[in-house]
Amino acid sequence: SXPLPLIVNTWPFKXATTIGMVVIHLKGYTAAGT
């Protein structure tokens, strides 16, 4: 936990933000894997 998850949970569009963050993380892992 950090302050970032707290801010994300406060945003009305947290869902979309969470999905976006997950996609970014997945892209990061994919780039690191290749």
Curated annotation (Swiss-Prot):
Reported modifications of this chain: Cleaved into an alpha and beta chain by autocatalysis; this activates the enzyme. The N-terminal residue of the beta subunit is responsible for the nucleophile hydrolase activity. N-glycosylated.
GO terms under biological process: proteolysis
One GO CC term, this protein: lysosome
Catalytic activity: N(4)-(beta-N-acetyl-D-glucosaminyl)-L-asparagine + H2O = N-acetyl-beta-D-glucosaminylamine + L-aspartate + H(+)
Highest taxon listed in the record's lineage: Eukaryota
Hydrolase as UniProt keyword: yes
Enzyme Commission identifier(s): 3.5.1.26
Function in brief: Cleaves the GlcNAc-Asn bond which joins oligosaccharides to the peptide of asparagine-linked glycoproteins.
Single GO MF annotation: peptidase activity
Protein name per the record: N(4)-(Beta-N-acetylglucosaminyl)-L-asparaginase
Main EC class the enzyme belongs to: hydrolase
Subunit description: Heterotetramer of two alpha and two beta chains arranged as a dimer of alpha/beta heterodimers.
The entry's keywords: Autocatalytic cleavage, Hydrolase, Lysosome, Protease
Similarity field: Belongs to the Ntn-hydrolase family.
Lineage start: Eukaryota, Metazoa, Chordata, Craniata, Vertebrata
Compartment annotation: Lysosome
Active site: 18
